């Protein structure tokens, strides 16, 4: 592991100058939704220029966000936007304003990529009870239309776009994400031995 400290745009510029290319970028940029000094949105044009230069073809660019920042983020690069996950924190936040609006229990995880499809290695979920069905091109299909096909037993299912990881308490950083969530995203978008920024 190599750690860098500094302005992210300057650090990426140095890395690019050194010839560094990464397989995935997983980051939590400032959303600009608080009055905190550090919560200043990175200029989108400058950010995308660096991210697009450092990511390998088909690499995933994974960016956390919440509204209204997430909408602005997507629209800043709609050409390369792919889809969202919703991180369910299990515990709501925003008790101070719960009298005026619902507590916030989720955050967006926006996926971008410079090519067609981004590299994706879904972590299958074990089914409570296996199901049987016919498969054509790896999808369940009408058994009557596929009578000559063998019945398969499906013990696992594909993930949904909801990521349930309990929010961390007693953190070092105010927007710190759970280690388990970060591990999940790393395993979903890279293979062992690949480089993540």
Where in this protein do the model-derived segments appear?
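Core catalytic lobe of class I
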Residues: 1-197
């Amino acid at each position: 592991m190599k750690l860098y400290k500094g302005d992210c745009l300057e650090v990426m510029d140095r890395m690019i100058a050194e010839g560094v290319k990464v397989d995935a970028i997983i980051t939590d940029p400032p959303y600009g939704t608080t009055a905190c000094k550090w919560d200043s949105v990175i200029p989108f044009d400058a950010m995308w220029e660096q991210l697009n230069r450092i990511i390998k073809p088909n690499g995933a660019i994974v960016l956390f966000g919440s509204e209204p920042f997430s909408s602005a983020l997507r629209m800043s690069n709609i050409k390369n936007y792919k889809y969202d996950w919703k991180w369910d924190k299990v515990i709501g936040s925003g008790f101070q304003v719960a009298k005026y609006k619902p507590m916030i229990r989720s955050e967006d995880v926006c996926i971008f990529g410079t090519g067609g499809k981004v590299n994706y290695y879904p972590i299958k979920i074990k089914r409570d009870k296996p199901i049987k069905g016919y498969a054509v091109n790896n999808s369940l299909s009408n058994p009557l239309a596929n009578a000559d096909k063998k019945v398969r037993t499906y013990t696992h299912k594909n993930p949904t776009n909801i990521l349930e990881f309990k929010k961390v308490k007693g953190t070092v950083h105010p927007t710190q994400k759970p280690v388990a969530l970060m591990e999940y995203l790393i395993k979903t978008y890279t293979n062992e031995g690949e480089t993540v920024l």
